[in-house]
C-alpha cells in the first residue's frame, strides 16, 4: 500500500482548516460546552496526521463526511443554542452520558476505524455511502428547518411561545431529525467496511437516540399533555408507517 499522496494530504489539510475556522467562529459567537462537544466530535476525525499506509479514497470519504455534516451540526447548534438552555444539573448530566457521549463515541470511533481500513472502496460501497449520507443530511436539515429555532436545541428545554410540532415531516414521524442522523450514522458504518465496527457504532448511536427520546417524550407529555399523547398514539417514532 502506497503512502497517502501529497495531493490527498493537501485536501485533508484544507478540510481540517476550513472546519477549524468555522468551529472557532462558532465558539466566539456561543462559547459553551455543547458547542465544544459538537466541534471536537467532527474536528478529531479531520486531523490530517498519523495517516501512514492508508486507503486514500476511504480517508477522503471520512474527511468530507465529517466536514459537511460537522458544518451542518455546529452551525445549527450555534444558531439555536441559548445560554439559559445550558444548565449543569442532573438532567443535563443524564443527557450528556446517556445520549451525547454514546453518539460521539459512535461517530469518532467509526471514523477512525474507516481511516485505518486498507480495503479499497468499490463503486457499490461508494454509491450506498453517498445515498445514505445525502439522504440523511438532507432529511436532518429539512427537519431542523421546519422545527425552527425555538424547538430545536441541544438540551431538552422549552421556551416561551413554543408550540407542539405536528405538521410537515412531523406529521409522518415523531423524530425526523434523529431519523436523518441515523441514516448518516449508517453511512459512517458502511464506510468502516467492518460488520463489527459498523454494528457496534450503530448500536451506540441508536442507544443514545433512544435514551434521548425517552426523556424528551416524557417532557413533551408534561408540557403538552393530551395533545402530545394523541399525537404520539397516531404517529410513528422513526419512520412512516412503522407505528
Feature-to-residue mapping (PLM):
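Extended hydrophobic secondary-structure segments
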Residues: 105, 177-180
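Active-site-proximal inter-transmembrane loops
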Residues: 154-178
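Membrane-anchoring alpha-helices and their flanking helix-loop junctions
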Residues: 1-158, 188-219, 223, 229-243
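Cytosolic histidine kinase catalytic core of two-component systems
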Residues: 177, 226-227
